[in-house]
């Protein structure tokens, strides 16, 4: 159905003039598939009239709320400039993320200006390693088959296509409706979803992390 108008929630939010601009997280596994490799890059911006000192403190919490990794760095940022801070950690015996066991950690990023907290940004993190590599079994032409592996284990995708549509609400899909769809998918032993034919709402991806669904995204 072709519908016009605003289809998703619209938000207005404010940040301090000295705040977090963007961040990038990489959370994978080493060759043992047991230990986590955590990388965080944070862009801090300063829109104040004068230079300032900004500190970024990150904490990584497990499901019980225990801090398993934390670090902080401070940068002197001139007016209207952006500075990138980088963090790298190796974490032993992490709880890995798969569709069967979607273990998530909570990342908290705290921005401080001269010791005072400006903002705290939360983000969910899952440790998994994705590989596409050949196996011993060969095709009729003699070439080896190539398989998808998650955390060292071969994976068979069993999924569905999904449109951002509901018979009652049109293209406006609430979190309640998303959760109902995801619960039906899991009840039918599905582990993946293909988005037709556009990116979904941000909350959709967060719930895929929570429920344990691999996402075949489209743009």
Residue ranges and their predicted role:
Residues 1-202, 207, 211-215:
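Secreted/periplasmic carbohydrate-active enzymes, especially glycoside hydrolases
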């Amino acid at each position: 159905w072709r519908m016009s108008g605003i289809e998703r929630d619209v938000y207005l939010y404010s940040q301090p003039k000295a705040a977090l601009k963007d961040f990038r997280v990489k959370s994978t596994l080493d060759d043992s598939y047991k230990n986590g490799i955590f990388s965080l890059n944070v862009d801090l911006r300063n829109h104040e009239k004068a230079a300032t000192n900004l500190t970024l403190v990150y904490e990584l919490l497990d499901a019980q709320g225990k801090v398993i990794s934390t670090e902080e760095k401070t940068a002197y940022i001139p007016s209207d400039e952006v500075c990138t801070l980088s963090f790298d950690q190796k974490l032993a015996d992490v709880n890995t993320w798969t569709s069967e066991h979607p273990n998530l950690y909570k990342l908290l990023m705290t921005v401080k200006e001269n010791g005072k907290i400006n903002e705290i940004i939360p983000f969910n993190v899952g440790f998994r390693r994705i590989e596409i590599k050949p196996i011993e079994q060969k095709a009729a032409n003699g070439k080896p088959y190539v398989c998808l592996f998650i955390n060292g284990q071969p994976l068979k995708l069993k999924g569905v296509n999904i449109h951002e549509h509901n018979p009652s609400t049109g293209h406006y899909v609430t979190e309640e409706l998303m959760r109902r769809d995801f619960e039906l998918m899991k009840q039918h032993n599905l582990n993946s979803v293909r988005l037709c034919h556009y990116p979904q709402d941000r909350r959709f991806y967060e719930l895929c992390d929570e429920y344990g669904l691999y996402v075949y995204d489209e743009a």
